[in-house]
Amino acid sequence: IYPRERDYDEFTSNQDNLWKYPDWYEGLKDKAKEQELWNLFLPKEYAPWSPGLNNLEIAGLFETMSKAAWSQQIFNCNAPDRGNMEVLAKYGTPEQQEQWLKPLLAGEIRSAYAMTEPDVASSDATNMELEITRDGDEYILNGKKWWTTNVVTPKCKFMLVMGKSNPENSRHQQHSTIIVPTDAEGFEITRALRAFGEYHSPGGEGDVVFKNVRVPVTNLILGEGKGFEIAQGRLGPGRFQYAMMFVGMAQRALELMCERAQNRVAFGEPFSKKTSVQHEIARSRCDIEQCRLLVLASAEKMDKYGIDAARDYISMLKIVAPKMCEDVSSRAIQIFGGMGVCQDTPLAHIFTTSRFCRIADGPDEVHMSQHAKLTMRSLSV
């Protein structure tokens, strides 16, 4: 993958190639399949869809697979597909699994997850306005979503959409999750969004509208009013996997930082001799190792006691990991100077991805408030 990094960046940054993949891309995926490095992210409780690894075993693999920005796609463990596969493996009917899960696991299609909305504060996961109304053997969807990752690429064939189906219920039982094919009549991508000025092609984030979109009732996942339960089940493991990704990206930034410090000379000596640079390297190593150990502790807790028992650790990871990666990549950029902010290194992408993810799947502040409550409850304060 490393030898192809520059090729990939040059191809995807060319506006003529928007939403396309390089010709050689599928060949790398075939190699991953041949070497049995495919779908490793599904832990063994997702049998028969899992290769049989536990979360602790997955953690180190996922860290390594995340060192190149786009490499997760080569191993079929990229978001939001991996989260959607987990949902379908855990909650999907046999028919839903046959139609949607199997092609995802084979890497034949891609998918999106439509949760965030433009007209409400999405830091509240129950705060949604998209309506899901039953009409005989169909559900009708009306509303807007945005920051719908993957939806722009032609390979995206369906979305998991969360909306309000039962407003009469209590707050956490008002929403449902339903499968919507991207070719459904009434569904429209109104624009592709730029994150830090970039389209994130070939996946992309979309601003989308549902106008009387009809889907069969068999597309509903788990049942009416189960949307929040599904979202929490999906986002919990997703945050753990994001944390492993950030450890991998930060480790890559540290490796590049050390290489630069040893090889770059200023005022008659290598950067590595400068006390300020040494301190930045040491601080970065400490930050990465602390986060890595928290990832491993979270994985062990999930394996022993389940995801629900590990929610406090997963919450800590969502707070710590993106900020850690942002800080490490920022230090590396400072040592690289102008090269650090251009396309000649992956550092700019690492920095913007980690900054973006301090908002995605819930902002830092929400997780810190929630974690404070969990902490006080555990200490009986």
Task: List each model region and its residues.
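Alpha-helical interface subdomain recognition
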Residues: 1-69, 77-79, 91-96, 103-108, ...
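A short, Trp-centered hydrophobic/proline-enriched beta-strand micro-motif
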Residues: 107-116
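A short core secondary-structure module
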Residues: 137-138, 142-190
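Short Gly/Pro-enriched turn/cap motifs at secondary-structure boundaries
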Residues: 119-123, 150-154, 167-169, 196-204
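Conserved hydrophobic/aromatic beta-strand scaffold that supports enzyme active sites
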Residues: 112, 129-131, 138, 158-162, ...
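Flexible, small-/acidic-enriched active-site or ligand-binding loops
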Residues: 127, 183-214
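Cytochrome P450 core scaffold surrounding the K-helix E-X-X-R motif
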Residues: 49-50, 122, 189, 219-224
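Flexible, glycine-rich active-site loops centered on histidine and acidic residues
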Residues: 85-91, 113-114, 168
